[in-house]
Amino acid sequence: ALRQTIHPLNAAPLLTLINEQEKTLMKDLEKKHLADCREDFMRRRNTRDRRDVAECRKRLDAFLELWPDSAERETVAKVRDFLNVIQGGVKGKLSVVKGKINKETTYDKPDVFVTVSQGNKELLHTKMIKDNWYPEFNEGVDITWTVDMPPLTFKAIDVDPVMDDELFTHHEESLGFDGYKGLSKTITDTGCELFIEFKPNTPIPDCPWLK
């Protein structure tokens, strides 16, 4: 109605001003929408609830639909694609690669094996490596990582004729949007080290908001 009133007066400068104000308003709304999406993502990133992944993804889908010409479209799409991949869980192989035994924890070179368990369920029991401070295992188990996956327990056991010695115990809680990264690192306990590695069956796309 305002445009129809102005047009007969040939008030081109005023129409230009209105157009510029509309563009500014829309940019501000887009900026606020993006900020809300990012804030929601950061608030949920350490979640242990898969529903948080779905809620974040829905928000980003709505942003991409509402602002198809956004300068941030590519970034938002990458975040959305990342959430799509992790929402249902990521299948891959969790491996116990190698270890380093603290010489102060045992009298002589240990005969050591490693177990990986989840609650009361043993997922992996490696072969025993004899007489070695630096055992190499290179054994793994297929798992599905999810944001709500229960903690994993890693133990290194020194086999002894009288009584086995527990040299190492580590509980790994791989929660949150990027919790899978916690399954590829060197874990430590009592001066001992164990290198573990998680290799997804399909690549997980980079997430710009987690860098």
Indicate where each model-derived feature is located.
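Short solvent-exposed coil/turn linkers within tandem alpha-helical repeat scaffolds
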Residues: 2-25, 50, 61-79, 131, ...
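Alpha-helical linker/edge segments of TPR/alpha-solenoid repeat scaffolds
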Residues: 21-43, 80-91
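Short coil/turn connectors between adjacent alpha-helices in alpha-solenoid helical repeat scaffolds
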Residues: 43-52
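C2/C2-like lipid-binding beta-sandwich modules
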Residues: 81-113, 202-211
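Peripheral membrane lipid-binding modules
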Residues: 103-191
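Compositionally biased low-complexity segments at domain edges in trafficked proteins
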Residues: 184-211
